[in-house]
Amino acid sequence: MAPVGSRESLHAALSSGADAVYFGVEGLNMRARSSANFTLDDLRDIAATCREAGVKTYLTVNTVIYDSETELHGQILDAAAEAGISAIIASDIAAISAARARGLEVHISTQCNITNTEAVRFYSQWADTVVLARELNLDQVRAIADAIDREDIRGPHGGRVKIEMFCHGALCMAVSGKCYLSLHQMNSSANRGSCTQICRRGYTVTDRETGDQLDIENQYIMSPRDLKTIHFLDRVAEAGVRVLKIEGRARGPEYVATVVRAYDRALRAICDDGAGLTPELVEELDTELSKVFNRGFWDGYYLGQRLGEWSSKYGSSATRRKKYIAKAVRHYPRLGVGEFIMEAGELHPGDEIVITGPVTGALVTTVEQIRLDVDPVEGAYKGDTFSIPVPARVRPGDRLYLWEPV
């Protein structure tokens, strides 16, 4: 399941192997502040686009909801039902019951902090899929999965309840994301989708009685590294997890494309070709995942670790960064070539690039050749109109970035 916070990310997910996408509209979702989100008017088009691609659509309505938002809440659910959205991801019982009253399938958000079989049984009154708490280890996940099978716990649609877990992306230092730090310091509630991420800053610990500053190994003491499970994804699957969820609705389309493609390849190696997760494949996928936004990686709590691992810097530890240089003008499908205008910087054969657009998604490729008019050249510079081979269609206005090593 891929995170979608923009049109670019949506099409990046669709072209990279995602089986489902999740996203928010208007407010009432946990990334209302940090991602672009969509409007109610977008729902029908998103649902139709994904349906045509054979991809399911999951709408997040997973914040705390107040009485004053009942009308908006109802409008969102009505629009979701009318558009044919596959399911609602929710945590507030008001959203859960209202969605079921409209005939919408419900998935229980990780905000509900489900850690045991009885909680799964309780939510199975409304939900066909539950996201377990991120603080569980794989033995605990396996015990819950076994209990669902053994006790035949079924959701409203008649099938056994499915377990969904996060497999990659940002983690919060609070239990299942229930954090009040942003509200306390900035009057902006994380539980309302408005986290200001002040936990990601560097902090100095001071003894208030003496004024002494304490020497700590890492100043980013509230900023966890990102979760990565690709090197033990076979164990996650064996634990009974049926839906893998990637975090990252606030991240760019190149992140979505890269992470979805990596986990798709890993799953196919585990399930389809019998080769499994070889050390060579894991190393290759690790290299790819390191290129896009991350705060460093750790295993989360899945392998039994009790304490978190913290970031060592502010912002991303990615090995690549995007630098905008050009805008697409047209595409020549028979030639497999895109034409661009260089607006900043320069480009040379062998450079790695990312091309993004609301319909294009994210294309990651290496420049094989550059032409000015019909003549091959060794570089394109500011003001040049140039053409390069592209792996798929590009559209006027698409943005071309140099994806350069950090």
Give short role names for the model-derived ranges.
Residues 124:
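Positively charged, amphipathic and often flexible ligand-engagement surfaces
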Residues 96-101:
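Short active-site loop/helix that positions an aromatic residue
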